[in-house]
Regions:
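Post-Walker A helix-loop "phosphate-sensing" segment adjacent to the P-loop in P-loop NTPases
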Residues: 31-42
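Walker A/P-loop
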Residues: 23
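A glycine- and Lys/Arg-enriched "phosphate-lid" helix/loop adjacent to the NTP-binding pocket
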Residues: 101-154
Length: 193
């Protein structure tokens, strides 16, 4: 309706491959909107009393995904939040559809080349980027794992309400790009400079 101001979404879910900047962009975006930021992986670790790698070691990916699903559902009680999801959180029909119904989903898109550059030093702490002996992948093996995972996950990521390509952008520029994408939805009335 013309002249009627749209309400901002109660929750903004940031999704994308590990290393795309969800945990870096999220707090800055939240500050600009007057929202609170939460990282879903941090919430899972707090509730489990273990790190993500420890959860993977003790129970495998299946146990981790069950805890992740439960933590995602808990965000329904949060208002005025920017929520950084894990790289695989919304790579399932059930979780993606739930997030699409319960907030605005923003996919932070990054090229494979940039992901390899960002993730090479961090592979030691990322179970999905390790071999069967829990050793970090490197070089061509790391690139192949990223390509393989991204190929499967991007089908889900691209269903987000907003897709924001952050390649070549500084963190500040990426925050501005997300804000620009959200403005059409009416979030800008809360924006702080």
């Amino acid at each position: 309706m013309e002249g009627q101001e749209l309400s901002p979404p109660v929750r903004i879910y940031l999704t994308g491959f590990m290393g795309c900047g969800k945990s870096t962009i999220g707090p800055l975006l939240a500050r600009r909107l007057g929202y609170t930021f939460i990282d879903l992986d941090t919430l899972i670790e707090q509730q489990a009393g273990r790190t993500i790698p420890e959860i993977f070691t003790m129970g495998g990916e299946v146990a981790f995904r069950a805890q992740e699903r439960a933590a995602l559902r808990q965000t329904a009680a949060l208002e005025a939040y920017v929520i950084a999801t894990g790289g695989g959180t919304l790579a399932s029909e059930e979780n993606l559809n739930w997030a699409l119904r319960n907030g605005r989903v923003v996919y932070l898109q990054v090229s494979v080349e940039e992901l390899v550059r960002r993730l090479a030093p961090a592979a030691i702490s990322r179970p999905m980027l390790q071999d069967q002996h829990r050793q970090p992948l490197q070089g061509a093996a790391l690139r192949q794992r990223i390509v393989s995972l991204l190929r499967r996950r991007e089908l889900w990521y691209l269903q987000a309400h907003h897709v924001v390509d952050t390649d070549g952008l500084s963190v500040a520029e990426a925050v501005e790009a997300v804000l620009h994408a959200l403005r059409a939805y009416g979030v800008s009335r809360n924006e702080r400079r």
